[in-house]
Amino acid sequence: MLSPDIVAQIAGELAEADRTHSVIPRITARYPDATVEDSYAIQGVWRDSQIAAGRRLVGRKIGLTSKAMQQATGITEPDYGVMFDDTVYESGAEIPVDHFSNVRIEVELAFVLKHPLEGPDCTLDDALAAIDYAVPALEVLNSHIELEGRTIVDTISDNAAYGAMVLGDVHKRPDEIDLRWVPGVLSRNGEIEETGVAAGVLGHPATGVAWLANKFHQHGARLEAREVILAGSFTRPMWVSRGDQVLCDYGPMGTIECRFI
Protein backbone atom coordinates (compact mmCIF):
# COMPACT_ATOMS: atom_id res chain seq x y z
CA MET A 1 0.00 0.00 0.00
CA LEU A 2 1.19 3.49 -0.83
CA SER A 3 1.45 6.12 1.90
CA PRO A 4 -1.05 8.99 1.91
CA ASP A 5 1.76 11.37 0.96
CA ILE A 6 2.66 9.36 -2.14
CA VAL A 7 -1.03 9.01 -3.09
CA ALA A 8 -1.41 12.80 -2.85
CA GLN A 9 1.80 13.36 -4.81
CA ILE A 10 0.68 11.15 -7.70
CA ALA A 11 -2.80 12.70 -7.72
CA GLY A 12 -1.12 16.10 -8.02
CA GLU A 13 1.01 14.89 -10.93
CA LEU A 14 -2.11 13.66 -12.71
CA ALA A 15 -3.94 16.93 -12.06
CA GLU A 16 -1.04 18.83 -13.62
CA ALA A 17 -0.93 16.41 -16.57
CA ASP A 18 -4.66 16.96 -17.06
CA ARG A 19 -4.20 20.72 -16.98
CA THR A 20 -1.29 20.69 -19.42
CA HIS A 21 -2.48 17.76 -21.59
CA SER A 22 0.76 15.92 -20.96
CA VAL A 23 1.93 12.44 -19.95
CA ILE A 24 3.70 11.23 -16.79
CA PRO A 25 5.87 8.11 -16.25
CA ARG A 26 4.10 4.90 -15.28
CA ILE A 27 3.13 4.71 -11.62
CA THR A 28 3.86 0.98 -11.57
CA ALA A 29 7.40 1.57 -12.86
CA ARG A 30 8.09 3.85 -9.90
CA TYR A 31 6.00 2.00 -7.31
CA PRO A 32 5.81 -1.67 -8.42
CA ASP A 33 4.00 -2.71 -5.24
CA ALA A 34 1.08 -0.31 -5.83
CA THR A 35 -2.31 -2.05 -5.64
CA VAL A 36 -5.74 -1.55 -7.17
CA GLU A 37 -6.83 -0.08 -3.83
CA ASP A 38 -4.00 2.44 -4.11
CA SER A 39 -5.12 3.36 -7.61
CA TYR A 40 -8.69 4.10 -6.51
CA ALA A 41 -7.27 6.16 -3.62
CA ILE A 42 -5.23 8.20 -6.12
CA GLN A 43 -8.26 8.65 -8.35
CA GLY A 44 -10.33 9.73 -5.33
CA VAL A 45 -7.84 12.41 -4.26
CA TRP A 46 -7.67 13.69 -7.86
CA ARG A 47 -11.49 13.69 -8.13
CA ASP A 48 -11.91 15.63 -4.90
CA SER A 49 -9.36 18.21 -6.05
CA GLN A 50 -11.31 18.73 -9.27
CA ILE A 51 -14.60 19.18 -7.40
CA ALA A 52 -12.90 21.64 -5.05
CA ALA A 53 -11.75 23.58 -8.12
CA GLY A 54 -15.37 23.97 -9.26
CA ARG A 55 -15.96 21.08 -11.64
CA ARG A 56 -19.34 19.32 -11.32
CA LEU A 57 -19.61 15.55 -11.32
CA VAL A 58 -22.29 14.27 -13.72
CA GLY A 59 -21.68 10.53 -13.77
CA ARG A 60 -19.33 7.58 -13.99
CA LYS A 61 -17.62 5.61 -16.72
CA ILE A 62 -17.10 1.86 -16.67
CA GLY A 63 -14.11 0.38 -18.46
CA LEU A 64 -12.52 -2.99 -19.21
CA THR A 65 -15.92 -4.62 -19.66
CA SER A 66 -14.96 -7.19 -22.30
CA LYS A 67 -13.49 -10.61 -21.47
CA ALA A 68 -10.62 -9.99 -23.89
CA MET A 69 -9.61 -6.73 -22.19
CA GLN A 70 -9.86 -8.27 -18.72
CA GLN A 71 -7.67 -11.20 -19.75
CA ALA A 72 -5.16 -8.86 -21.40
CA THR A 73 -4.82 -6.80 -18.21
CA GLY A 74 -4.92 -9.72 -15.77
CA ILE A 75 -8.04 -8.61 -13.91
CA THR A 76 -11.39 -10.25 -13.24
CA GLU A 77 -13.71 -7.25 -13.12
CA PRO A 78 -14.20 -3.87 -14.83
CA ASP A 79 -12.90 -0.55 -13.56
CA TYR A 80 -14.51 2.88 -13.23
CA GLY A 81 -13.82 6.60 -13.30
CA VAL A 82 -15.73 9.86 -12.92
CA MET A 83 -17.15 12.28 -15.50
CA PHE A 84 -17.44 16.06 -15.11
CA ASP A 85 -19.85 18.47 -16.77
CA ASP A 86 -17.17 20.12 -18.89
CA THR A 87 -16.39 16.81 -20.64
CA VAL A 88 -19.82 16.27 -22.23
CA TYR A 89 -20.36 17.03 -25.93
CA GLU A 90 -23.36 16.66 -28.23
CA SER A 91 -23.36 15.02 -31.64
CA GLY A 92 -21.97 17.40 -34.24
CA ALA A 93 -19.38 18.84 -31.87
CA GLU A 94 -15.92 19.98 -32.83
CA ILE A 95 -13.50 18.60 -30.24
CA PRO A 96 -10.03 20.13 -29.71
CA VAL A 97 -7.61 17.22 -29.97
CA ASP A 98 -4.94 19.06 -27.99
CA HIS A 99 -7.19 18.99 -24.91
CA PHE A 100 -6.31 15.30 -24.55
CA SER A 101 -3.37 12.89 -24.61
CA ASN A 102 -3.22 9.59 -26.55
CA VAL A 103 -6.65 10.26 -28.06
CA ARG A 104 -8.84 7.29 -28.99
CA ILE A 105 -12.57 6.70 -29.50
CA GLU A 106 -14.79 3.89 -28.19
CA VAL A 107 -18.40 2.98 -29.03
CA GLU A 108 -20.74 2.71 -26.04
CA LEU A 109 -24.21 3.18 -24.61
CA ALA A 110 -24.84 5.57 -21.73
CA PHE A 111 -27.63 5.26 -19.19
CA VAL A 112 -29.36 8.02 -17.22
CA LEU A 113 -30.76 6.92 -13.86
CA LYS A 114 -34.24 7.93 -12.74
CA HIS A 115 -33.70 6.97 -9.10
CA PRO A 116 -30.78 5.98 -6.86
CA LEU A 117 -29.24 2.53 -7.23
CA GLU A 118 -27.48 0.82 -4.35
CA GLY A 119 -25.73 -2.50 -3.67
CA PRO A 120 -24.67 -4.90 -2.34
CA ASP A 121 -27.04 -7.24 -4.18
CA CYS A 122 -27.98 -5.17 -7.22
CA THR A 123 -28.97 -7.28 -10.25
CA LEU A 124 -29.39 -6.55 -13.95
CA ASP A 125 -33.15 -6.31 -13.40
CA ASP A 126 -32.61 -3.79 -10.60
CA ALA A 127 -30.39 -1.73 -12.88
CA LEU A 128 -32.90 -1.80 -15.73
CA ALA A 129 -35.65 -0.68 -13.33
CA ALA A 130 -33.50 2.27 -12.21
CA ILE A 131 -32.63 3.42 -15.74
CA ASP A 132 -34.67 6.26 -17.21
CA TYR A 133 -33.27 5.90 -20.71
CA ALA A 134 -30.34 4.73 -22.81
CA VAL A 135 -28.54 7.02 -25.25
CA PRO A 136 -25.74 6.22 -27.71
CA ALA A 137 -22.36 7.63 -26.77
CA LEU A 138 -18.78 7.86 -27.95
CA GLU A 139 -16.08 7.91 -25.31
CA VAL A 140 -12.93 9.94 -25.90
CA LEU A 141 -10.07 8.12 -24.18
CA ASN A 142 -7.42 10.33 -22.63
CA SER A 143 -4.30 8.73 -21.14
CA HIS A 144 -2.00 10.86 -18.99
CA ILE A 145 0.29 7.91 -18.22
CA GLU A 146 2.69 6.45 -20.79
CA LEU A 147 1.01 3.55 -22.57
CA GLU A 148 3.94 1.14 -22.91
CA GLY A 149 3.84 -1.36 -20.04
CA ARG A 150 0.80 0.27 -18.44
CA THR A 151 -1.23 -1.88 -16.00
CA ILE A 152 -4.69 -1.66 -14.49
CA VAL A 153 -3.19 0.23 -11.53
CA ASP A 154 -1.95 2.96 -13.86
CA THR A 155 -5.25 3.12 -15.74
CA ILE A 156 -7.50 3.38 -12.67
CA SER A 157 -5.27 6.04 -11.14
CA ASP A 158 -5.65 8.01 -14.38
CA ASN A 159 -9.46 8.17 -13.99
CA ALA A 160 -9.83 4.97 -16.03
CA ALA A 161 -8.47 6.84 -19.09
CA TYR A 162 -11.65 8.91 -19.42
CA GLY A 163 -11.43 12.15 -21.38
CA ALA A 164 -14.88 13.08 -22.67
CA MET A 165 -18.09 11.69 -24.12
CA VAL A 166 -20.21 12.63 -27.11
CA LEU A 167 -23.93 11.91 -26.67
CA GLY A 168 -26.42 11.10 -29.42
CA ASP A 169 -29.94 12.42 -29.84
CA VAL A 170 -32.04 9.23 -29.57
CA HIS A 171 -33.28 8.20 -26.13
CA LYS A 172 -34.80 4.75 -25.54
CA ARG A 173 -36.32 3.31 -22.39
CA PRO A 174 -35.03 -0.18 -21.58
CA ASP A 175 -38.46 -1.66 -22.36
CA GLU A 176 -38.55 -0.06 -25.82
CA ILE A 177 -35.59 -1.89 -27.35
CA ASP A 178 -33.48 -5.01 -26.78
CA LEU A 179 -30.33 -3.21 -25.74
CA ARG A 180 -28.15 -6.27 -26.33
CA TRP A 181 -28.56 -5.94 -30.08
CA VAL A 182 -27.83 -2.25 -30.53
CA PRO A 183 -25.10 -2.15 -33.21
CA GLY A 184 -22.14 0.18 -33.60
CA VAL A 185 -20.46 0.86 -36.94
CA LEU A 186 -17.59 3.28 -36.37
CA SER A 187 -16.09 5.22 -39.29
CA ARG A 188 -13.17 7.62 -39.58
CA ASN A 189 -13.06 9.93 -42.60
CA GLY A 190 -15.62 7.80 -44.43
CA GLU A 191 -13.89 4.44 -43.84
CA ILE A 192 -15.40 1.82 -41.52
CA GLU A 193 -12.83 0.99 -38.83
CA GLU A 194 -14.67 -0.91 -36.08
CA THR A 195 -17.99 -2.73 -35.65
CA GLY A 196 -19.64 -4.33 -32.65
CA VAL A 197 -22.87 -5.06 -30.81
CA ALA A 198 -23.80 -3.97 -27.29
CA ALA A 199 -24.09 -7.55 -25.98
CA GLY A 200 -20.28 -7.56 -26.09
CA VAL A 201 -20.39 -5.55 -22.86
CA LEU A 202 -20.72 -8.21 -20.15
CA GLY A 203 -23.52 -9.94 -22.11
CA HIS A 204 -25.83 -6.93 -21.64
CA PRO A 205 -24.73 -3.28 -21.56
CA ALA A 206 -26.65 -2.57 -18.34
CA THR A 207 -24.87 -5.36 -16.45
CA GLY A 208 -22.06 -2.92 -15.74
CA VAL A 209 -24.49 -0.54 -14.05
CA ALA A 210 -25.41 -3.27 -11.56
CA TRP A 211 -21.73 -4.10 -11.07
CA LEU A 212 -20.96 -0.44 -10.38
CA ALA A 213 -23.75 -0.13 -7.80
CA ASN A 214 -22.36 -3.16 -5.97
CA LYS A 215 -18.80 -1.84 -6.20
CA PHE A 216 -19.89 1.52 -4.83
CA HIS A 217 -21.53 -0.20 -1.87
CA GLN A 218 -18.08 -1.54 -0.92
CA HIS A 219 -16.94 2.09 -0.74
CA GLY A 220 -19.97 3.20 1.29
CA ALA A 221 -21.65 5.03 -1.60
CA ARG A 222 -24.47 4.64 -4.13
CA LEU A 223 -25.37 5.83 -7.61
CA GLU A 224 -27.69 8.84 -7.57
CA ALA A 225 -30.70 9.84 -9.66
CA ARG A 226 -29.81 11.70 -12.91
CA GLU A 227 -26.27 10.35 -12.96
CA VAL A 228 -25.03 9.33 -16.40
CA ILE A 229 -23.35 5.93 -16.53
CA LEU A 230 -21.11 5.30 -19.53
CA ALA A 231 -21.40 1.55 -19.68
CA GLY A 232 -18.34 0.23 -21.55
CA SER A 233 -17.18 -0.20 -25.12
CA PHE A 234 -18.30 -2.83 -27.58
CA THR A 235 -15.54 -2.03 -30.08
CA ARG A 236 -11.78 -1.74 -29.88
CA PRO A 237 -10.43 1.79 -29.38
CA MET A 238 -9.85 3.77 -32.58
CA TRP A 239 -7.04 6.34 -32.70
CA VAL A 240 -7.94 9.83 -33.90
CA SER A 241 -5.92 12.89 -34.91
CA ARG A 242 -6.59 16.52 -35.70
CA GLY A 243 -8.79 16.80 -38.80
CA ASP A 244 -10.48 13.40 -38.40
CA GLN A 245 -14.23 13.21 -38.99
CA VAL A 246 -15.85 10.47 -36.89
CA LEU A 247 -19.25 8.89 -37.52
CA CYS A 248 -20.88 6.04 -35.62
CA ASP A 249 -24.12 4.40 -36.76
CA TYR A 250 -26.15 2.78 -33.96
CA GLY A 251 -28.96 1.50 -36.19
CA PRO A 252 -32.29 2.12 -34.42
CA MET A 253 -30.57 4.47 -31.97
CA GLY A 254 -29.38 6.89 -34.64
CA THR A 255 -25.92 8.25 -35.37
CA ILE A 256 -23.24 10.34 -33.70
CA GLU A 257 -20.86 12.62 -35.56
CA CYS A 258 -17.94 14.68 -34.33
CA ARG A 259 -14.82 16.28 -35.74
CA PHE A 260 -11.44 16.64 -34.09
CA ILE A 261 -9.82 20.02 -34.58
Language-model-derived ranges and their functions:
Residues E94-I95, H217-H219, L247-C248:
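Short, intrinsically disordered/low-complexity patches at protein termini
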Residues V209-P237:
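A conserved acidic, glycine/proline-rich C-terminal tail/linker
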Residues G232-R236, V240-C248:
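Low-complexity, intrinsically disordered Gly/Pro/Thr-rich segments
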Residues L2-H204, Q245, M253-I261:
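Catalytic-core "active-site belt" of small-molecule-metabolizing enzymes
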